[in-house]
């Protein structure tokens, strides 16, 4: 079950990435198209509410295990 909740700030499916604005935080979270596709989605919409986990890879944090809420 995802640990964090936030709102999609923007997502560009052509570029393959975007950012989520976490609830209660000003530090945006990177989200890659591969995480979106693993969630069975083709894109994320601006202002869409999502739940997610934070995963660190190569010193960078990103959203994984997305769930539209």
Residues covered by each model-derived region:
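Short coil-to-beta-strand transition motifs
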Residues: 1-5
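Short beta-strand micro-motifs enriched in acidic
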Residues: 11, 53-57
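Short, conserved beta-turn/loop elements at beta-strand boundaries and strand-helix junctions
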Residues: 13-15
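Beta-strand/loop nucleic-acid-binding surfaces
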Residues: 28-39
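Short nucleic-acid-contacting surface segments enriched for D/E, G, S/T with interspersed K/R
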Residues: 37-51
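OB-fold/S1-family single-stranded nucleic acid-binding modules
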Residues: 56-69
């Amino acid at each position: 079950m995802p640990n964090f909740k936030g709102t999609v700030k923007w997502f560009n499916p052509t570029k393959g990435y975007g950012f989520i604005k976490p609830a209660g935080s000003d530090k945006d979270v990177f989200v890659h198209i591969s995480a979106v596709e693993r969630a069975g989605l083709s894109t994320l919409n601006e202002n869409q509410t999502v739940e997610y986990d934070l995963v660190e890879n190569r010193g960078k944090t990103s959203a994984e295990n997305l769930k539209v809420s």
